[in-house]
A protein has these predicted regions:
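Transmembrane alpha-helices and adjacent helix-loop boundaries
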Residues: 1-248
Length: 248
């Protein structure tokens, strides 16, 4: 009769933790650069330059409508066939960055379009520089509105990093495949790996929450004020953002 036995896995705990660390590191690198790419593409798509807009549309549609596995294979095997070889970590992180960039661009673009035109015009009337209008009046409020969607996308990409095992990147799933082939304890191995992915997801959620608390102090102030008043906190997305310089 079958029974769970995790004892053969104990010697492999350092290997599991190393795979989890590589998965987390790969995700953090991809999220950082992917968010930058997403912001640039979102602004470029809104620019009144037809060629630039078309290029952004091609990039977004190509990434969003092709499998992530194929994208990794194109970068790792496709480029290698023309002499451009990359380490497995670099290829996986680059594919994840490109993927996150496309999805983040559309999420951020939706946030930018939700900023009232009158708010931007008011900032222009105050004589604010364009970079301040772009950052304080447009980007910050839009990021605050779409932050939960971005966080969910980052979590999905962390979980999709398991596909990197197909190019022998030594992340968590690749480690699991090696361990289960050594121990022949497939069920126990993948239970452990599922638990580690759950822990990684909770860590990323905690990091995202802390970052959100730091970046969006207005939301925190609204929540604390509502708590002191004994009322349910209002939706910060429905409250007009204060424009730097004193105008609302």
């Amino acid at each position: 009769m079958f029974s769970l036995d995790f004892s053969p896995l104990w010697p492999y705990w350092p290997t599991f933790l190393l795979g989890a660390w590589l998965t987390l590191k790969m995700t953090c690198v991809a999220v950082f650069f992917g968010l930058i790419v997403g912001m640039l593409v979102a602004f470029a798509k809104r620019a009144r330059v037809p060629v630039l807009t078309r290029l952004c549309i091609i990039y977004i549609e190509a990434v969003r409508n092709t499998p992530f596995l194929v994208q990794i294979f194109l970068l790792y095997f496709g480029l290698a066939s023309i002499g451009l070889r990359m380490p497995t970590f670099a290829a996986a992180a680059l594919a994840m960055t490109i993927n996150i960039g496309a999805y983040a661009a559309e999420i951020i673009r939706a946030g930018l379009e939700s900023v009232p035109r009158g708010q931007i015009e008011a900032a222009e009337c105050l004589g604010l520089p364009k970079w301040r209008i772009g950052w304080h009046v447009m980007l910050q409020p839009s990021i605050e509105k779409v932050y939960p969607a971005l966080t969910s996308q980052f979590l999905l990409m962390m979980q999709a990093s398991a596909i990197a095992s197909q190019i022998s990147a030594e992340e968590l799933t690749a480690v699991a495949n090696t361990v289960q082939s050594d121990t022949f304890r497939s069920l126990e191995t993948y239970i452990v790996v599922a638990g580690l992915y759950l822990v990684l997801s909770l860590i990323i959620k905690l990091i995202a929450w802390q970052v959100g608390e730091h970046l969006f102090k207005r939301r925190r102030a609204i929540r604390l004020a509502a708590k002191r008043a004994g009322k349910a906190p209002p939706d910060p997305q429905r409250i007009d953002t204060v424009i730097p310089g004193g105008a609302a």
